[in-house]
Amino acid sequence: MSKEKIAIAYSGGLDTSVMIKWLKDKYDADIVAVTGNLGQQKEIENLESKALATGASSFHFVDLRTEFVEEYIWRALKAGALYEDVYPLATALGRPLLAKALVDVAVAENCTMLAHGCTGKGNDQVRFEVTFASLAPHMKILAPLRVWEFTSREAEIAYAMEHNIPVSATKKNPYSVDENIWGISIECGVLEDPMIAPPEDAYQITTSPEKAPDTPAVVELEFVEGVPVAMDGKKMNGLDIIVQLNTIGAAHGIGRLDMIENRVVGIKSREIYEAPAATILHFAHRELERLTLEKSVFQYKKNISQDYANIIYNGTWFSPLRTSLDAFVNETQKPVTGLVRLKLYKGNVTLLGRTSPYSLYNEALATYTEADTFNHKAAEGFIHLYGLGLKTFNQIHKG
């Protein structure tokens, strides 16, 4: 009788490395380790040998970068999705795609169980399990970190050392880092005290603004219907645009974020993020929207942006609400076409210029020179009617 198979989302980090041996011993099952490439820079070529040496029966590496950019990141960018107005949702965006890839491999490998390495008080457990339940309701879900005997990362490190499991985390390097092409999240260690500034060794890719070049970088981005298509006059695919902006932005200290955020599970947490490309692209996209969107659409879309961010953050990507909001967002993005020129300097993104064939800015109406075509006399009647309701109210209640 063949053993049952468990497909696990494997990153090669502390939790999932320990998890392979723990699950194998507890369930006497074959472990199918699955790693998705979302553009993380850390070493990935040794993951297969590491997973197999740790006890996995097989290893699958799935390149998800293009799908991640085109079907996830660009949707979030067009929606203007920043969780609580700050977080560009790098980790949160990657989870439903990783979960989907894990389900695909699990089905192909005839697995009966799905496992993730998320903590019992984090957001990712929700994102993975809601996606699993949506796409593979027949499979059993395992969450070892909610039930195993290890009560701290130090205990996991000790277990790994005892069983010769190679891990990069040590008691001297306690940070938990999650990375993809859209950003990096950094937790644990001294970062758990919100009054302590993040040490420089916590940051993975960005240069400190104080040490950034004294000469700014200037970049020009072209958008078509809300999607970046070119950089500095050169047509490029989305993946390459993000890679280049991450490199340039990181060198100039762009995209360092430090926030207290409200988790799905009801607690507040202190999060450190690095997101150079996301910071630059959201800034540029928003400025192009200011130029091209009609006032009521621009202002109403802010509500949709937060709703969309909540959907991503809360793990309900595969929902009818998200697909319905996509339809609204796509309609708003039809005129969001044009060029945006930016300056990157010591941690700051500054707007230098923008233009669009669908610009609603009319210089002849806005100017205060002799070229002015605005009908000033019309303002008197407009103001009278505009303020009539308040005038009437105050006459009655203050009379």
From Swiss-Prot:
EC number in record: 6.3.4.5
Keyword Mitochondrion: no
Molecular function in Gene Ontology: argininosuccinate synthase activity; ATP binding
Pfam family membership, one: Arginosuc_syn_C
Residues involved in ATP binding: 9-17, 117
Reaction(s) catalysed by this chain's protein: L-citrulline + L-aspartate + ATP = 2-(N(omega)-L-arginino)succinate + AMP + diphosphate + H(+)
One GO cellular component, as annotated: cytoplasm
Database matches in CDD domains: ASS
Domain of life the protein comes from: Bacteria
Keywords from the UniProt entry: Amino-acid biosynthesis, Arginine biosynthesis, ATP-binding, Cytoplasm, Ligase, Nucleotide-binding
Binding site residues for L-aspartate: 119, 123-124
Location(s) in or outside the cell: Cytoplasm
Keyword Ligase in annotation: yes
Metabolic or biological pathway, per its Swiss-Prot or TrEMBL entry: Amino-acid biosynthesis; L-arginine biosynthesis; L-arginine from L-ornithine and carbamoyl phosphate: step 2/3
Disulfide bridge map: none
Xref: NCBIfam families: argG (TIGR00032), PRK00509.1 (NF001770)
Record family assignment: Belongs to the argininosuccinate synthase family. Type 1 subfamily.
Protein's name in the database: Argininosuccinate synthase
Organism listed in the record: Chlorobium chlorochromatii (strain CaD3)
